[in-house]
A protein has these predicted regions:
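Active-site-proximal beta-strand/loop segments in catalytic clefts of secreted hydrolases
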Residues: 23, 86, 111, 146-148, ...
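Structural motif corresponding to the early beta-alpha repeats
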Residues: 42-43, 47-142, 179, 240, ...
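Conserved anion-binding
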Residues: 142-152
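Histidine-acidic metal/acid-base catalytic patches
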Residues: 7-22, 26-44, 67, 74, ...
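Short, well-ordered, mixed-charge alpha-helical segments that flank or form enzyme active sites
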Residues: 117-119, 151-154
Length: 279
């Protein structure tokens, strides 16, 4: 058991917190990203630590960079709601969990890896996720994994199967409606099957049925075909009170483009939640 003295977790209460994954601002430093996220109206941020895509915290240098990230978040007035690592590499996740503990981040998000409809790959995925969730518990954080197009977990049935097999409090679901939509399901109806284990929501819109979610502008909440109001209603009705973080992927955006996506998405989500009495 690793004994780490961490900071108090930073979110709580009955209402959902809205955030943005800093990958949307991957062309800019973390200070600029946090300031833009706050200016767009959000409560907090998800820290992108995705190697090869966007590392606003370089995990190999987390001990020197984390205090700077913490100071930048405090200066901007944003809460650190979650961290995305994506990778299931054990050594990388050890660093992520240690950094999250220091920063007071309660949730670290990953993808499932593997291959859809391949039983051997699925079993490896389950074994790996279980092992990493046990490790997460040693650092006092929760590992959340989402269904991902093409991965071993790609739909509600495969998600349900995994959570039935990994009955650990340190393991949860990152429910991304765009991936469930691209699996041919209605996210607002699928949520009930996994809500009891949900710890995080990645959110974006999607035009068409995929496999890609579309260009960044088309991932703006309210611009696509997903019934996001219905999804928020299902979240609200369920009593979900975890983070909901906008995650927009694709080519690097200018600050104007990124701010437009963030601000428009916030306006849409905030209006939905106000209509539902959840903000």
């Amino acid at each position: 058991m690793v004994c780490v003295r961490g900071r108090k977790k930073q979110y709580g209460g009955a209402l959902m917190k809205l955030g943005v994954n800093t990958v949307l601002f991957k062309g800019f430093g973390v200070k600029a990203a946090f300031k833009a996220i706050k200016l767009a109206g959000y409560d907090g941020a998800e820290l992108s630590c995705i190697a090869g895509m966007c590392e606003h915290l370089v995990l190999d240098a987390w001990e020197t960079q984390a205090p700077l990230v913490l100071a930048a978040a405090k200066e901007a007035g944003v809460e650190l709601l979650s961290m995305e690592v994506a990778s299931l590499d054990e050594e990388r996740l050890k660093k992520a969990f240690a950094a999250a503990n220091y920063l007071g981040i309660p949730i670290v998000n990953v993808g499932p890896g593997g291959k859809a409809d391949d039983e051997e790959a699925f079993q490896i995925c389950v074994k790996t996720l279980r092992s990493r969730a046990v490790l997460a518990a040693e650092y006092g954080v929760k590992l959340c994994c989402k269904a991902h197009v093409g991965g071993s977990i790609y739909s509600t049935p495969t998600t349900k199967r995994v959570i039935d097999l990994i009955d650990l409090p340190s393991f949860g679901v990152d429910m991304d409606p765009s991936h469930i939509w691209r699996a041919g399901e209605k996210p607002e109806e699928a949520l009930a099957a996994v809500i009891s284990r949900m710890g995080h929501v990645h959110i974006r819109d999607c035009k068409g049925n995929g496999p890609s979610p579309g260009v960044p502008a088309d991932q703006t909440c309210g611009r696509g075909n997903i019934n996001l109001f219905g999804y928020f209603k299902a979240l609200t009705d369920s009593g979900y009170d975890g983070p909901v973080c906008l995650e927009v992927i694709g080519p690097e955006q200018t600050m104007v483009q990124a701010m437009a996506i963030a601000a428009e998405s916030y306006g849409y989500m905030n209006a939905c939640l106000k209509q539902l009495g959840a903000r």
